[in-house]
């Protein structure tokens, strides 16, 4: 841990989601106090399950909550891809002992609320993190000694620096960058189904995906296998805006009429759906603006096709902490090192996720090519292809 900073001012964090609370933990571990400004009336995560690769566990260990989170996770035996049209096996990636030896950490699935709770408990246990809810960041001003944040109630908050971790619709990014989100036209429906209602022949201990033309389905166990997360994605026929709302069973069924009955039955199970119209942004080279820096979805929102959104936010948090350890109380150099260490990697994730969406949703001849390319591929070949993503650690996170 770095020496305790001389100033009694906190670092301000806009956003109390996974990235914001992870950043709070990382900063406290470097001797800072933190004030989190969250717009929602209470902290929490919208959504259901989330997949965690080895890089996520490396980040959690660096934040000091690895064991706490491991106790809440479900460890899969494999990742499995089937063709949703004919049920054929496209590819299988074992995530057992050989996978763990290769990447020094497991592959797991966990409820978003459980990972957020682990982070929040870790932050609260430090006694150095203050959380203000119902606080909407409106404007940021800077001077040579720090930042002043103005919220929608007219209250000002003073800090050494500001971390903008306020999501896809980031107010901090809007002030400093001013770009628009790129609405993908892809819609995601998410639901949780109790084990007793889930088809027995699909109760696999795996992160399973069924890929189809302009659509795919994902399912995996949660919370000790007592629940199953069901996620379906399709290309919308309508003009979409980035949004989250209640889903329509009739709508989601209408997009999966051509897939095989075995996969389609999954869509008929949930009683309640949450609907996301997804968006990302074009990668940018500048995340740092004086004493303000972007993090997580505010910096690099990504589509879900690599299951890396939350993982990247936690990597950001750890890297930010490490940069401040190297350049203690030197904001210019610390923030520059943080930015230099993260921009290319996260841009690769954003662009790779777009391409993976195309592969998942291939149709016609492209579908045949996809299936042929992955057919019979050995675990080692898959692992080699994943090394750039899953090989990240707190020890190798800095660019120099």
What are these regions (language model features)?
Residues 2-11, 28, 53-175, 179-194, ...:
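Conserved N-terminal helical subregion
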Residues 10, 33, 227:
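Residues at the starts of beta-strands that form the adenosine-phosphate
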Residues 205-240, 249, 253-257, 278:
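Active-site substrate-recognition segment that forms the wall
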Residues 67, 195-202, 239, 262, ...:
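Short helix-loop capping/hinge motifs at secondary-structure junctions, enriched
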Residues 13-41, 163-164, 189, 219, ...:
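Conserved mid-domain beta->alpha element of the FAD-binding
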Residues 375-400:
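C-terminal auxiliary extensions adjacent to catalytic cores
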Residues 183-186, 202-206, 227, 261-277:
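A short coil-to-beta-strand element that immediately follows conserved catalytic motifs
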Residues 71-74, 130, 257-272, 331-336:
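Acidic/histidine metal-binding catalytic segments
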């Amino acid at each position: 841990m770095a020496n305790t900073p001389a100033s009694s001012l906190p670092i301000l964090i806009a956003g109390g989601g996974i990235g914001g609370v992870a950043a709070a933990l990382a900063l406290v571990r470097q001797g800072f106090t933190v004030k989190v400004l969250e717009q929602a009336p209470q902290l929490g995560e919208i959504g259901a399950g989330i997949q965690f690769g080895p890089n996520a566990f490396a980040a959690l260990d660096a934040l000091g909550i690895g064991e706490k989170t491991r106790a809440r996770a479900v460890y899969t035996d494999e990742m499995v891809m089937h063709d949703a049209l004919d049920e054929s096996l496209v590819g299988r990636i074992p995530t057992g002992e050989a996978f763990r030896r290769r990447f020094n950490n497991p592959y797991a699935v966990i409820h978003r609320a459980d990972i957020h709770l682990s982070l929040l408990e870790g932050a609260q246990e430090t006694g150095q993190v203050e959380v203000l809810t119902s606080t909407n960041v409106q404007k940021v001003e800077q001077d040579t000694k720090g930042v002043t944040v103005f919220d929608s109630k007219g209250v000002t908050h003073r800090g050494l620096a500001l971390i903008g971790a306020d999501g896809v619709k980031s107010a901090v990014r809007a002030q400093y960058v001013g770009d628009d989100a790129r609405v993908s036209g892809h819609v995601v429906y998410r639901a949780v189904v109790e084990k007793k209602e889930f088809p027995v022949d699909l109760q696999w201990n795996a992160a399973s995906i069924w890929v189809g033309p302009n659509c795919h389905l994902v399912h995996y166990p949660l919370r000790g296998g007592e629940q199953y997360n069901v996620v379906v994605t399709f290309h919308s026929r309508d003009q979409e805006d980035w949004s989250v709302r209640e889903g329509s069973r009739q709508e989601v069924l209408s997009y999966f009429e051509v897939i095989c009955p075995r996969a389609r039955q999954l869509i008929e199970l949930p009683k309640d759906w949450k609907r996301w119209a997804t968006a990302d942004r074009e990668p940018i080279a500048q995340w740092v603006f004086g004493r303000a820096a972007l993090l997580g979805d505010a910096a690099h929102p990504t589509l879900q096709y690599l299951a890396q959104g939350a993982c990247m936010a936690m990597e950001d948090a750890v890297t930010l902490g490490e940069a401040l350890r190297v350049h203690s109380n030197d904001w210019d150099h610390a923030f520059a090192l943080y930015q230099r260490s993260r921009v290319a990697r996260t841009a690769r994730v954003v662009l790779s996720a777009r391409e993976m969406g195309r592969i998942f949703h291939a149709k016609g001849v492209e579908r045949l090519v996809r299936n042929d390319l992955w057919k019979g591929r050995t675990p080692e070949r898959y692992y080699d292809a994943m090394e750039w993503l899953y090989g990240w650690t707190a020890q190798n996170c800095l660019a120099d």
